[in-house]
Amino acid sequence: CWDNCLILTVHSIQQIQDQIIDEFNFFKDWSEKYQYLIDLGKNLPEFKDSNRIDSNLIKGCQSKVWLNSSFDNNLVIFEADSDAIISKGIISLLIRVFSGHTPEEIISANVDFIEKIGLNSHLSQTRANGLLSMVKQIKIYALAYQAKK
């Protein structure tokens, strides 16, 4: 199969986190990094209004952050939105890291990119708590899908 073959490269959660770390290391200061977060948020795929329901709201976030999940071929797929642009950028990073992986991979993943890019120390306490709530909710969805198997 040399012609017309689709080669699908699947990156591990750690590889994706390493890519994000490399991207953030490119920027000189936090104003550039915040702008990058804002741009990431603006590029999130459109979130259906039908998914903006209370059961998809992440508890513990100061702003409204909706997280929807689905399960297909043993992979958890996430989509999200927020009414706050920084939160939208943060959740876009988390979706990039976790979406398209098995529940087991998500549950066992060590989320280290947040600290390595310095994001945790450049967020207000309420935003930092919201970030932890986002990660927690992603892992809860993965646990639920694992239990259903």
Where are the regions that the model predicts?
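Leucine-biased recognition of intrinsically disordered, low-complexity hydrophobic segments
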Residues: 6-8
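N-terminal intrinsically disordered, cationic/polar leader segments
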Residues: 10-21, 25-64, 71-72, 114-133, ...
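Solvent-exposed interaction patches of small proteins and small membrane subunits
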Residues: 55-62, 81-82, 104-109
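Conserved interaction-surface patches within small, structured recognition/assembly domains
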Residues: 70-86, 95-98
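Primarily the active-site beta-strand->alpha-helix module of PP2C/PPM metal-dependent phosphatases
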Residues: 91
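Glycine-rich phosphate/pyrophosphate-binding loops
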Residues: 100-117
